[in-house]
Amino acid sequence: IYAMKTHLFLGMDNLSKMGKRLKINTPIKENASSALGTTEINMIDYSNAFITLANEGEHVTPHIIEKITDNNDRILYEFKYQNEKVLNKKYVYILNNLLTETYDYKMIGYTSPTLMSISNDLDSKYAVKSGSTETDYWTIGYNKNYLMMVWAGNDDNDKVKARDSKITKKIWSKTITKIKTNKKEWYEIPKGITASSINPLTGEYKENGIVCFYEKGTEPNYIDKYSN
């Protein structure tokens, strides 16, 4: 399991530390299974973390009320935006592009990406992630203009049915595609990032392979031995 191997390689305390940097207020336990999502995290905490990715490494606190005025238009309350740089923009760009592969037909191999059921619904580029437990399903996705999360479960915390696993994915995809804007929806490539065509099975360069993004100097510069 790649997530767990990476978690153990980096040190179990690093996941907890990163959670705090991303404003996840729920304490993440420092054990091996935390990499698989065994810590229960609420929607606000999830949104806190993914907002930072959607905002290219800068965190903005999620809020419900933007402004309150009286009948004379005097401002009684107004939310104050305070952006905080949390992550390096270059690495966030790489991660955001990786999260577009969750619904990419090109990534079908020994198994299918987890969001293939919504691939045909999407008419723009989004970074999307989904998750599930015995008691709930969730899907979260974004571009540079919008972030939306959908959760489904039972009020009594009863187990959910496997046949309902696509519910949050479909609600998310059908709703997000109704939101239109004239603004550019995907991110500009930051300085210091380059693209390379690779064989995803080996990570080596392959002409007409899958395009992945790298920090300059780390891209593969050797030919995939399995290339045609």
Identify what each model region corresponds to:
Residues 42-48, 52-227:
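A penicillin-recognizing enzyme superfamily signal
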